[in-house]
Amino acid sequence: MSVTGPIWPPIWTEQDFADHSNVPRGTLSDFIHWYGLLRKWNARINLVAPKEIDQFWRRHAYDSWQLNAHLPKKWDRLVDLGSGGGFPGLSLGIFSKQMGAGEVYLIESIRKKASFLKTVTRELGLPITVHAARIEAVLPLEADVLTARAFAPLPRLFDYATPHLKPTSVLILPKGESADKEIKDARAHWHFDVERFKSVTDPSASILRVMNLRRKGA
């Protein structure tokens, strides 16, 4: 799996996505199917902002796909918090299907959105389990990898994530311009190591790779 360097045209087509992500034909077909379902369901429930639906291929699909480059070489269980329209959870499920990797668990408390996630999972035959529940109501999942996109600032995100982590867990977290402040705020209450990578879709954004997370005083 590979991605190219940062470029930001306003609107991408499915071919732009294919060219920059280097996905095989079958994987591209899964993304096309997902996009069709997203457009259909978005007319009834708010999965993405209407003005962003035409930006699916860069703003959502490629932005999610870039996380694959930061995953551990081997993982068995990946948990995505607040999965919404499936970014990045469904994308990671498609990647796992392609690569024969582990199981993906999506947690989404809004039942209509969870129904959408289940529909895409079923129709694409993805290795995904959808939990239609609040995060704190889900039994500990012991994730090897945990992701969340546009979900919560780091201090609160760590609170939600901790019950589902192991000492060896890795968190892969897309963040925007507030990343520096969020890291500083989180260090007031948490010990952790963090690596930061530039986003390939947004020059002001980054991908955080967090390890060895533990609460101070614990």
Report the location of each language-model feature.
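Conserved beta-strand signature within the Rossmann-like core of class I S-adenosyl-L-methionine
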Residues: 168-178
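A short glycine-rich, Lys/Arg-flanked "PGG" loop and its adjoining helix->strand segment in the class I
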Residues: 158-170
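Conserved beta-strand segments of alpha/beta enzyme cores
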Residues: 103, 127-129, 170, 191-195
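Short glycine-rich anion-binding loops that position phosphate/pyrophosphate groups of nucleotides
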Residues: 84, 150-153, 177
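Class I SAM-dependent transferase core
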Residues: 1-75, 79, 111-126
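Residue-level signal for inorganic ion chemistry
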Residues: 38, 92, 174-175
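Active-site capping/gating segments
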Residues: 178-218
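Conserved SAM/SAH cofactor-binding pocket of Class I
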Residues: 65-148, 158
